[in-house]
């Protein structure tokens, strides 16, 4: 399993853990190294262990963390392993009630009723969709996984999520040289109502590229 622990600037002030739900990934996003292979889905205990290990390895007292986030957004598509993810979140919510839990997903074509029901039951769970492009055509090239929601369908799921939980869902958009025009922004605004969705903007980090280099590219795009 791959898990990443972030510190901003001290663990007590803010701790973010990104953990995996699968070994490899069946989705095959073109920018992701994990998409080249898929081995298996993790059990709930294996997902929870990643969080426990990150905290214990750095001797972090989770109860003292002021801003604590646990995100399933490393290897794997979490909603293609939902039964085990649900069990893992139930355990994590019990062990770390001060942690915000986040599902980051490309939006596979599944039944979202159990997902939203879990988010109603566990009040710390957030939902983020990896949108990345302003049209389905461009997104299909970046994420060539057939069994996924369209952008319009993602928007509709987000509206249901807000209505049922009272919490805004997120969409993530990877900015690059070819999708940052005003026309792209207008398309995104038409699809994802700001009264419903929160937006996060990121940059695609190539497999052989450092995070620092990727950040430099994002700053260039934003300037």
Residues covered by each model-derived region:
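Generic structural motif recognizing short loop/turn segments at the entrances and edges of beta-strands
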Residues: 1, 13-15, 123
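Canonical Radical SAM [4Fe-4S] cluster-binding loop centered on the CxxxCxxC motif
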Residues: 7-49, 53
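Conserved AdoMet/S-adenosylmethionine-binding subsite of the radical SAM
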Residues: 56-69, 74-222
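A short loop-to-beta-strand scaffold at the N-terminal edge of the catalytic core in hydrolase folds
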Residues: 2-6
């Amino acid at each position: 399993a791959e898990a990443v622990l972030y510190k901003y600037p001290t663990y007590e002030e803010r701790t973010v853990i990104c953990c995996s739900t699968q070994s490899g990934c069946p989705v095959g996003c073109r920018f992701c190294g994990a998409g080249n292979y898929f081995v298996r889905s993790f059990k709930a205990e294996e997902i929870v262990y990643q969080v426990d290990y990150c905290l214990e390895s750095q001797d972090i007292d989770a109860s003292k963390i002021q801003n604590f986030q646990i995100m399933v957004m490393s290897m794997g598509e979490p909603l293609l392993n939902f039964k085990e993810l649900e069990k893992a979140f139930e355990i994590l919510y019990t062990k770390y009630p001060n942690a915000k839990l986040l599902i980051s997903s490309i939006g596979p074509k599944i039944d979202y009723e159990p997902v939203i029901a879990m988010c109603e039951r566990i009040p710390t769970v957030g939902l983020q969709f990896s949108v990345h492009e302003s049209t389905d055509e461009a997104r299909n090239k970046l994420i060539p996984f057939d069994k996924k929601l369209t952008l319009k369908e993602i928007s509709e799921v987000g509206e249901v999520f807000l209505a049922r939980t009272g919490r805004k869902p997120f969409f993530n958009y990877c900015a690059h040289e070819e999708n940052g025009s005003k026309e792209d922004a207008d398309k995104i605004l038409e699809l994802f109502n700001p009264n419903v969705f929160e937006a996060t903007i990121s940059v695609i980090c190539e497999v052989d590229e450092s995070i620092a280099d990727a950040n430099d590219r994002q700053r260039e795009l934003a300037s």
